[in-house]
Amino acid sequence: MMSEEVRLRPWRRALQTLLVLLLAGGCSRIPRIIVLEDPLTAAEHVELGVAYERKGELDLAQREYGRALRKDAKFYRARVNLGNIFLAKKEYGKARKEYLLALELRPGDADASNNLSWAAIFSGEGIGEALTRMESVVSGPNGRQPTLLDTLGVLRMRANHPGEAEEAFALADALCRQAGAASKEGVSAAAPCPEEVLREIEEHRGELRRRFPSASPAPAD
């Protein structure tokens, strides 16, 4: 006997279709009804998206973050992660949109503000707005973090404020090294500053020296 799949949602429509087919005169085929439901929660879709993202499968990660947002449009982490996917794909306008939506959910949030700043840096658009936002984030509670200060330094450099950019980079470098030293001595339970963050800070300071040689710090005696 032949069968065919009729994928309908919700289940009431599927049942109605089945009754119509069964009552139709001369119908000898009984279709198999499959009612598709999404068993995953929004949080589970985000977890799946993160797993895909770590494997470099950005399209699949984007799909899962989109599914999470269809279930919960106010899911902050899904918004930021989706913005990160667009940023990685160099779709800066779309990334900016997602970060702004995330900031509507959490005004002044450091992560969303930081990533929105990088959308501005990479695209070259909205540097002034991003700089104002990051100045506010860094001056707020818990704002003195190496990664945030590094981003602030890059924004200042792009806005042609080399002296202020060097101040941000120098403070980011100092805090990063202090965290590493404290962790080694067992003084702090916080994780040490990753080496990649130190490398990024030094790379950005190198870019600053190339762009603005006069902004280079004076050599130590």
Residue spans of the language-model regions?
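Helix-start (N-cap) detector for alpha-helical repeat units in TPR-like alpha-solenoids
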Residues: 35, 42-43, 76-77, 110-111, ...
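Position-specific recognition of the canonical hydrophobic site in helix A of tetratricopeptide repeat
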Residues: 46, 53, 80, 87-88, ...
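Alpha-helical adaptor scaffolds
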Residues: 88, 100-147
